[in-house]
């Protein structure tokens, strides 16, 4: 079993759409929210602004059913592939990444 490195408190977590690989959002997980995610099969995060756990979609219904959980080479960043119900972003957009800053040639 791989041990995730929570020594710095929170772990950046990238959420991908399992159907097409699109990046949906970036959030942070505490050890407790990670355990809840593993146990329930739905994403749980730690809100830095509210200083509390939150279950993605609990209020909006826009849930994220976990399909796969990956870790990076240092075990301090997570990538989770999900089946997304509704938009992932609180703005109503499918992805939180919709502001293009620069486009290459």
Curated annotation (Swiss-Prot):
Chain residues that bind Mg(2+): 72, 74, 76
A single cellular component GO annotation: cytoplasm
GO biological process per UniProt: L-histidine biosynthetic process
Pathway, per record: Amino-acid biosynthesis; L-histidine biosynthesis; L-histidine from 5-phospho-alpha-D-ribose 1-diphosphate: step 3/9
Keywords from the named record: Amino-acid biosynthesis, Cytoplasm, Histidine biosynthesis, Hydrolase, Magnesium, Metal-binding, Zinc
Family matches, as Gene3D superfamilies: Phosphoribosyl-AMP cyclohydrolase
Named cofactor requirement(s): Mg(2+); Zn(2+)
Localization (cell): Cytoplasm
Enzyme Commission number, as recorded: 3.5.4.19
Cofactor binding description: Binds 1 Mg(2+) ion per subunit.
One Pfam family of this chain: PRA-CH
GO molecular function per UniProt: magnesium ion binding; phosphoribosyl-AMP cyclohydrolase activity; zinc ion binding
Catalytic activity: 1-(5-phospho-beta-D-ribosyl)-5'-AMP + H2O = 1-(5-phospho-beta-D-ribosyl)-5-[(5-phospho-beta-D-ribosylamino)methylideneamino]imidazole-4-carboxamide
Residues reported to bind Zn(2+): 73, 89, 96
The family this protein is said to belong to: Belongs to the PRA-CH family.
Record's function text: Catalyzes the hydrolysis of the adenine ring of phosphoribosyl-AMP.
The name this protein goes by in its record: Phosphoribosyl-AMP cyclohydrolase
């Amino acid at each position: 079993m791989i041990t995730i490195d929570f020594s710095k408190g929170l772990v950046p977590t990238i959420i991908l759409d399992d159907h097409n690989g699109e990046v949906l959002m970036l959030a942070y997980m505490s050890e407790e929210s990670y355990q809840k995610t593993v146990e329930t099969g739905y994403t749980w995060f730690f809100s830095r602004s509210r200083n509390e756990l939150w279950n993605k979609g609990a209020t909006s219904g826009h849930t994220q059913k976990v399909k796969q959980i990956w870790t990076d080479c240092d075990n301090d960043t997570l990538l989770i592939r999900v089946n997304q119900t509704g938009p992932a972003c609180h703005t109503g957009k499918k992805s939180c990444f919709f502001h293009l800053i620069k486009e290459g040639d």
